[in-house]
Amino acid sequence: MAKSTRPSPDFQDKFTLTFPSPFIVGIGGTTRAGSTSELALRATLAHAEGLGARTAVLCATELVMDAYDPMVKTRSASAQRLVQLLREADGIVIASPSYHGSIPGLLKNALDYTEDMRSDERPYFDGRAVGCVVCAEGIQAMGTTLFTLRSIVHALRGWPTPYSATINSSSKPFGPDGLLREEAVSAQLKTVAQQVVQFAHFSLQAKAMPQPTA
């Protein structure tokens, strides 16, 4: 029987002590506070916090910004905060509803602001794992929206995590109190969180390694 390659608890404790807690930024939701995609985003970040990560969330009206215009040099406070948090992020979670088979303009416009990061040492989402969560009322919409979202992450040089979560909004997975009541959905979001945090740890570990000299 093959031996397990899962890190031992002692190894995980040493890893946590040696490297800083990863900072995971979540963006998504709709203009309606408490939407399924917003609640899914917050639940995913809660799982990430349970794994020792620090988190920040941008959703609902926090994503309402002027249409991105590369020719305009001034930025609103919301846009500045978005870009600054993404610059600091070690990992990212994006939770999107499906609007007519794709991501909504609200989210796409927010992602367009990453163009302000094009000249950074880590441009766009470079070097960051990105977990994708899609909420829709139909299987077809889930598939097309997830494909679009993962394609955008690729275009921004991010690493979409191997696992992405798809949630059927019509099943009402969250109760009136905003808490998850479907274990299968919770398991999906936990997997996304685990992969984002794990890859963020790997990235932090690589940065801490001595760089070869000429």
Describe the function of each predicted region.
Residues 51-56, 158:
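A generic structural motif
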Residues 4, 77-156:
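Helix-loop-strand module that forms the ligand-binding subsite of alpha/beta enzymes
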Residues 60-77, 173-177:
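N-terminal beta-loop-helix "entrance" segment that forms/cooperates
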Residues 6-52:
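N-terminal beta1-alpha1 ligand-phosphate binding loop
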Residues 2-25, 159-214:
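Glycine-rich phosphate/pyrophosphate-binding loop and the adjoining helix
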